[in-house]
Amino acid sequence: MPHSNISSTPRQQLTERVLQAKAANNLTWASLAEDTGLSVVYVTAALLGQHPLPQAVAEVVAERLGLDRDAVVELQTIPLRGHVEDVSSDPTIYRFHEMVQVYGTTLKALVHEQFGDGIISAINFKLDIRKVEDPEGGERAVITLDGKFLPYKPF
């Protein structure tokens, strides 16, 4: 039976334990997600407190991290999502806020022009990030946001 958190505290505390264990065991997000059948993005988001994990995956990941049975149960609990304090103070996260501030109205206009009145789902959603070489030198981040379009329906 699925359980749900009504406070962000349990997942925040577990996230701290996950980060400590990840560092202590010299693990990567990719190594934690390996052979789980889930994407590295989804497993990372779950371990950072934004998604529940299926029982089998929670058990595998907890074992890799050396976490106890209580952590396995908490990893399966539906979290209070999006409840992250002070996200705008982190420079990396703030750049994403800045991108939406600058391009949000453009994205909205183009989505509506191409799809009509509606939204892009963050529930039926996939996210991918990859590093590519920049022809002008250095590296670039290619971030793909892949969400299902959900039209508004008159009633």
Swiss-Prot record:
<protein>
    <recommendedName>
        <fullName>Cyanate hydratase</fullName>
        <ecNumber>4.2.1.104</ecNumber>
    </recommendedName>
</protein>
<dbReference type="Pfam" id="PF02560">
    <property type="entry name" value="Cyanate_lyase"/>
</dbReference>
<dbReference type="Pfam" id="PF21291">
    <property type="entry name" value="CYNS_N"/>
</dbReference>
<feature type="active site">
    <location>
        <position position="95"/>
    </location>
</feature>
<dbReference type="GO" id="GO:0003677">
    <property type="term" value="F:DNA binding"/>
</dbReference>
<feature type="active site">
    <location>
        <position position="98"/>
    </location>
</feature>
<dbReference type="InterPro" id="IPR003712">
    <property type="entry name" value="Cyanate_lyase_C"/>
</dbReference>
<comment type="similarity">
    <text>Belongs to the cyanase family.</text>
</comment>
<dbReference type="GO" id="GO:0009439">
    <property type="term" value="P:cyanate metabolic process"/>
</dbReference>
<dbReference type="GO" id="GO:0008824">
    <property type="term" value="F:cyanate hydratase activity"/>
</dbReference>
<comment type="function">
    <text>Catalyzes the reaction of cyanate with bicarbonate to produce ammonia and carbon dioxide.</text>
</comment>
<dbReference type="InterPro" id="IPR048564">
    <property type="entry name" value="CYNS_N"/>
</dbReference>
<dbReference type="InterPro" id="IPR036581">
    <property type="entry name" value="Cyanate_lyase_C_sf"/>
</dbReference>
<keyword id="KW-0456">Lyase</keyword>
<feature type="active site">
    <location>
        <position position="121"/>
    </location>
</feature>
<dbReference type="InterPro" id="IPR010982">
    <property type="entry name" value="Lambda_DNA-bd_dom_sf"/>
</dbReference>
<dbReference type="InterPro" id="IPR008076">
    <property type="entry name" value="Cyanase"/>
</dbReference>
